[in-house]
Amino acid sequence: MSDKDRITQLLRELEEAKAREAQERCEKERLQLEHRKTTFLEYLRNCHRHLYNALRLTDTSRSSTGYTKVVGKYYPKRLRPWTNFTNVLHPHYFNLVQQICGQRQLFESASTTKNLGTIISDHLAGNEKAIDRFEVDAVERPVQGILKVLATHEEAGKASICPEFRFSANLRELTQKDDGSSGADDNTSDRSLERRQQAGPNKRPTSKSKYICSNRQPDGVGIRMQPDGGQTQAFIYDYKAAHKVAIEHVRSATAKEHLFHEVVARINDDKLSRDEEVQHREQAEAFIAMALTQVFDYMITYGVSYGYVAAGRCLLLLYVDRDDWQTLYCHPCLPADDVGEPTNDWTDRLSHTAVAQLVSFCLSSFQSEALEGQSLETALSVAKATLKTWSESYADVAYLGLEPAELSSAPSSQNTDISEYTSKAKPTGRKVTLRSCKPAAVLPQGNEHDEHDEEDHSEPGASRLAKRERGPSSGGKDDGRSMVDPQPTRQYCTQACLLGLKRGKDLDENCPNVSLHRFDGSSRHPVNAHSFTDMVEQQLLLSPYKGCRMVDFWGKRGAMGWLFKLELLPYGYTFVGKGTVEDRLNRLEHEGRVYARLDHLQGDVVPVHLGLVRLDRGYILPGLEFAVYMMLMSWAGQTPSANMDDAETLKSESLTAIWSEGVDHGDNNRANYLWNAERCRIMIIDFDRAHLFPPLKARAVSRLSKPKRKRETLNSYLTEITGREARHVFKQMDRSPMATPSHGG
């Protein structure tokens, strides 16, 4: 090889080495870029490209079929574009989040998002359950991650735009069948509803039975944390199979102001076009109208102004103004159309991604307070007088589709009898405007609405609501909604106070309300346990909201009920009630029997049990449920702090105490073990799943030859307790005088 050839070869090798080095450097940078955290805009791009676009739909012939059951549910009179979200709210919040996040790398890496997208693409989505999984992974999880960053950011915190937040899909717990014998406690309203809606003695279903709704349980709810630690609903959402909200018809359907009237009329008349293309469009419109109706009904009955339908390829973001119940505002979110194909620079289109729009939707909803208790009942009374339920028709739109000749021949009674469709509420009640759902003052909500009742017995809740309208008003005769029942605001009475009331002993001077309990300078309680329960029941019979409020619907609910704070107004006794629905009375009665077994442990190991009362009208709950029974108790305390070192030891001591009385708690949920500062110990609550057995009396235990046999007796119980707890129970048992063999024969 000549020198010239040698030089040429060396130069070529040098160039190749440089190229390899450059390639390795690029690959290293690419990997670093893939694995580093991302900025806000990068994260939106990755979520759309790798998650949203990963959705694969099954063939429609293999998809789930059937209509959404909406008969008996409220539906709006008008459907209008939510232009205030499109033009004001979304641009404002998108720019605000972009400003707060800036170029900081706060979100998960591109490689993590890609890996999740691969998992999503491995599964075909053909039903609501599959869409549920997709929405959680591709939309809800990223949205919650972005909101979490905002909640911890100082600027956002000062503006109070973003509290702690979570998506929750655990709404069906109270209607699901319990294990074992408690299965008899199932809510029977669905079965009775079906029976009421069957036609004739032969029990044949009506022609509309496929549309009949059986419950008001949405797929999910957006939960926000309150400053006091409570949790309230911000919005409601529901999943729909992608083929039930056909994206090719979404824009045209949601642009129809009288979509609901058209669909209801077609279904009532049982008429479909013979043209196959028109028939397909009409069926798509029916699916969309029913999906919107379902969420609209949830929004009304759960007391929120915001909701959305998630159907994989699209989101339908919804809003209702409490000053205009008959109008539903809708913003269709179609990312595939609005974002389009990926390009080098998506910046101007990233605001149209599903994640970006749902973030703005959530932030908008946080500026509105959910209605509850008395305000929810008032709102539902207005809704019942204003709205129609599927498949009733609104009077003034019933003939929109008729020709003049047909209109003149229509029954005159339907044109002139306006009273049937106007509010039956007292005129004075209209003077009070319900709480506005407008965002902060700096964000004008705009004028979304124009200037421009038959009782439904298909739902148990609706029937009870009608009863409330006929019953006495909690606010007086002249201004039914202008007066609000007094709410309990005092500190809880002490265990010693309420135990003294129950036992007929002296007042507890350490009770924060003792001055209200004392009459004529006496040291004794002014009432006994029996009269106390009677007076509480009479107070709640006058109004379920008088001296009573729900503590925390989402955070303080158990397997069968909710927690209420109550005050017996003349005497200042302040305590709690465990409220439940009609069909769970036997569970409360069973719990009362458990408290009776634990009588001498009340006020120390378990709360003081003060009896059971019935609320004739019921305390309204989100979703048109009613708490009609309450078990009255002393306030047990708070969840032990995470840094309480001896919490498990104290818990085991309390478990040992109730076991010795013949009670197996049966529910090891940590929420059932509360720290009581007054007694300096863990108190146990919620005995609806407890089992009773003969108590371990000292004489019976003395016949055991050795403590080991008692350990065997406890074995089944201790299998549900951690090893450390079990060892402590044994240690306590060995130290107990009951465990010492008797030498007296």
From Swiss-Prot:
Impact when changing residue 240 to A: Abolishes poison activity while retaining antidote activity
Recorded coiled-coil stretches: 4-34
Annotated region described as Required for poison activity, given as residue ranges: 491-745
MF-aspect GO terms: DNA nuclease activity; kinase activity; toxin activity
Residue ranges, compositional bias (Basic and acidic residues): 188-197, 466-482
Ranges annotated as biased composition (Polar residues): 208-217, 409-422
Region named Required for antidote activity: 214-325
Localization annotation: Cytoplasm; Nucleus
Keyword field contains NADP: no
GO process annotations (BP): meiotic drive
Keywords, sorted A to Z: Coiled coil, Cytoplasm, Nucleus, Toxin
Assigned GO CC terms: cytoplasm; nucleus
Region (Disordered): 173-222, 407-487
Biological function: Promotes unequal transmission of alleles from the parental zygote to progeny spores by acting as poison/antidote system, leading to poisoning of progeny that do not inherit the allele. May possess DNA nuclease activity that leads to spore killing, and a kinase activity that confers resistance to the nuclease activity.
Protein name: Meiotic driver SPOK3
Gene that encodes it: SPOK3
